[in-house]
């Protein structure tokens, strides 16, 4: 039997500090994490505090479109 739309969807989290600063000159790249969220419990965009290896500190990572 087929189910309806799944409640859990994969999302990409991207460092907001790297995007705003245009990435450090020493390192190229933007920190991204893949996680899941429940569409019914969190309908708005997800923001989590994660470690960014390019900024060398914990920064806010926000949900982006695929």
UniProtKB/Swiss-Prot annotation:
GO-annotated biological processes: translation
Organism domain of life: Eukaryota
Matching InterPro entries: Ribosomal_bL33 (IPR001705), Ribosomal_bL33_CS (IPR018264), Ribosomal_bL33_sf (IPR038584), Ribosomal_zn-bd (IPR011332)
Localisation per UniProt entry: Plastid, Chloroplast
NCBIfam families for this protein: PRK00504.1, PRK00595.1, rpmG_bact
Family: Belongs to the bacterial ribosomal protein bL33 family.
Protein name: Large ribosomal subunit protein bL33c
Organism of derivation: Helianthus annuus (Common sunflower)
């Amino acid at each position: 039997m087929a189910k309806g739309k799944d409640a859990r969807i994969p999302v990409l989290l991207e460092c907001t500090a790297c995007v705003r600063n245009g990435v450090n000159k020493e390192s190229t790249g933007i920190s991204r994490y893949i996680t899941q969220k429940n569409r019914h419990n969190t309908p708005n965009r997800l923001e989590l505090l994660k470690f960014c290896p390019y900024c060398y500190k914990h920064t806010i990572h926000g949900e982006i479109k695929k």
